Amino acid sequence: QAFFEDKDAFLSSISDEKVRHFAAINYGPWDRLNGDTPFLSGYEDKALGAEFYPHDMEKKEFATADFGDKQGLYSMVKRDEAGNLYSVPYSEAFKSELMKASDLLKKASELAEDESFKQYLQLRSEALLSNDYLASDMAWMDMKTNPIELVIGPIESYEDQLFGYRAAFEAYVLIKDLAWSEKLAKYAAFLPELQQGLPVAEAYKAEMPGSDADLNAYDVIYYAGHSNAGSKTIAINLPNDERVQLEKGTRRLQLKNAMRAKFDTILVPIADTLIVPEQREHITFDAFFANTMFHEVAHGLGIKNTLDGSGTVRGALKEHASALEEGKADILGLYMVQSLLEKGEITEGTLEDYYV
């Protein structure tokens, strides 16, 4: 989905060990943390649509074409022999790989001791082959007691920079931190109140997210696919399916060990350079953790469908959806932190800690 060459052949063609390692990190010849700039000679700029669409396809052609699953999350767009566009479900496009993954999930479900986790693994294994992820997303939200967490499948659409329609495959294996999760649990009860307190017109907060949403902390032990490309994700808000969000809410997963590593090795050195000395006392892990957490909480708030009923907000915003959604989450997260500080529900630190 991200690169058109065979992975093993591509990496073996790079003689310099450090460059080869950098290419493996980026899942291709483009620097993902520098605007997808090519760092190997012989490669052009990365296609905005990655491998989801034909490289020679223009937006105008796509807009006027008529074919099934045109804006599908779980399909590739191809050309037929006559040059016409058509879609191929992931379950067909990656059939051999998904059959292997599905079989492994079934075997894992037989070993699972937690019944809800067993059910999720079974449904997810079926979803990989049916291309219908709704039932398994619902089952994932129903899991509450599993100490091991698996997030797997086509999930985020950031890789599709052309339209933001299509999701890329990824996987996480996580271990739940029970002590930290208990500390975070109290915030879930405030989500309906936070939704109603949004500083916007009533029409933009009429949709009430499911009250079954939860906040949990985890240690991540494995990344693969999109979540492992370029940088490492430190927090997740899932599922992305608007139907699940409205019925079940979302789960906010805070990847504590990854967050700690980012704070110690990246954020603090940057702060020591950019932040004036008298403000550095406000650089705290608690504030960093909370800002990240409420950023993810903010993804689940607001409306998911357009006011005129024409479709989803994500579909209407197209390729701009991801950037606007991330900006919304940043600002709304700080708004919620301030509200909870004023209520006395957050007791760690000062408002300056969270803003600095």
Question: Which residues are covered by each model-predicted region?
Answer:
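Contiguous, non-catalytic segments that form substrate-binding/exosite surfaces or channel walls
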Residues: S87-R280, T284
